[in-house]
Amino acid sequence: MKTQNGKLWSTLNDGKFELRSMTLSDLEESLKVLDNAFFINESVCKGCEINLPHNSQAREDLKELSRITAQDGVSLFVRHLESGRIVAVAFNKLQFAPPPGEDTFFVKFRNEQVKSPSALRLMDYMIAEDAKIDVLADYNMDCVCELMFLATLPEFGRLGLGTTLTKYTIELSRDILQGGHALENVAEELRDKRPAAVNALWTSEFTHNIGKAVGFKVLNKTPYTEFEFNGKRFDERIGPQHKFSELAMYKL
């Protein structure tokens, strides 16, 4: 992960926004987008009560997960140029099989660093859903780029920023696969990794539509009636609009 001046991938909406690789200087402001959008509005965050004001420890746990994830150097953000604000983010993680006998990244983080029951439940959801399809083994791949957290500030919604971040996550991953300039932002110890796909857990109708529009293949669907936390099923907290999550993949 570079310190500053991340790669400019595109300008958007007649030059009103720019999309860049996330660097250390962008990280804390990017985490605020999670605080002000993702943790409040994302379906599984609601199911795990991470959206409730008193669950600050859960949000801190997941921001630490995002800080570590960002160190890979494959995360992206969108900046609104007139205000200078970061308004949308994609926290992306290079995922690969750990050495024999070691835990995967999510399992290791869950076991060693998570303190909040709400964050533990969200991590358990992610781990369980990822485990339903062994993407690396089943599709004969050594590495994928996981689009872990995708978020846009509500006041900048419906401008296609999430879709564009998803498209450029694919483009960035393809550039790394081909040994291109995106490698310059990747952590040095990961520069031998070559993602052969982008995968994601789409958790709302909005992200289902993004995945469909961009061309992701749905590998598995799980209704929210199958998950519980603190005496309630996820669907009871999420509401009727978003009924299930999807594990999806875009093969490069």
What are these regions (language model features)?
Residues 73, 242-248:
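Short hydrophobic/aromatic beta-strand or adjacent loop that forms the aromatic wall/cage
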Residues 19-21, 90, 146-147, 191-202:
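Extended hydrophobic secondary-structure segments that form protein cores and membrane-embedded regions
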Residues 149-152, 158-185, 213:
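Conserved acetyl-CoA-binding loop-helix of GNAT-fold acetyltransferases
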Residues 45, 85-157, 183-187, 220-243:
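Conserved acyl-donor/pantetheine-binding loop and adjacent beta-alpha core of acyl/acetyltransferases
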Residues 162-177, 192, 217-240:
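C-terminal/domain-terminus segments
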Residues 177-196, 201-228:
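Conserved active-site alpha-helix within GNAT-family acetyltransferase domains
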Residues 19-22, 30-32, 153, 160-165, ...:
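Ligand-binding pocket scaffold of soluble enzyme catalytic domains
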Residues 2-64, 69-132:
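Short amphipathic alpha-helix that is part of the acyltransferase structural core
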